[in-house]
């Protein structure tokens, strides 16, 4: 289902844990990491599609989360031709998305990447709020920045201040330039002293594995389903 400009209606999900870190999933059998997302089926509202995708990709039910906010308007990105099936080229241009910010009300063990027989992710981790901008595939970076920026104002006040600090130049991609105690990989968190250290807390859902560094592999995103691109 495409609009007249060739964009497929889609929803994106930013899921927060109790530490206001975001869920980050590794697409199955690839080195590509992203937020949960998926197309809106005919007859669905964006919120209905969001809850369906939440269950299909992460295994969570509506009672596991609280809807904090959503973006006001559609956010669009174009998908390069090399990532589009040949039979869709010339018709499919990209995605237009409504993004939802959700708070996890349950526990890590409620997440299940094998909730359906067509899983989207085979590993996951919690990251600081802005870290995904450093590792998401290039053509999605703009829409990720728009969504994260618009929804950041709904974070708790203290977390807003902390994220402004991280966003202003101390994001993990750049941290290796600041001294011997800094780090460069996603999923690490600042120590109170001002240096950076590994956060050892990581729980995996059923059937998942853990890739400790999503930046270690080349991003290869081949999408048989345009709704996931």
UniProtKB/Swiss-Prot annotation:
Domain (Nudix hydrolase) ranges: 6-149
Database matches in Pfam families: NUDIX
InterPro entries xrefs: Nudix_hydrolase, NUDIX_hydrolase-like_dom_sf, NUDIX_hydrolase_CS, NUDIX_hydrolase_dom, RppH
Region annotation (Disordered) ranges: 168-229
Span(s) of short sequence motif Nudix box: 38-59
Cofactor(s) this protein cannot do without: a divalent metal cation
Domain of life of the native organism: Bacteria
EC id: 3.6.1.-
SUPFAM superfamilies per UniProt: Nudix
Keywords: Hydrolase
MF (Gene Ontology): pyrophosphatase activity
Entry's family note: Belongs to the Nudix hydrolase family. RppH subfamily.
Known role: Accelerates the degradation of transcripts by removing pyrophosphate from the 5'-end of triphosphorylated RNA, leading to a more labile monophosphorylated state that can stimulate subsequent ribonuclease cleavage.
Protein name per UniProt: RNA pyrophosphohydrolase
Organism from which the protein derives: Delftia acidovorans (strain DSM 14801 / SPH-1)
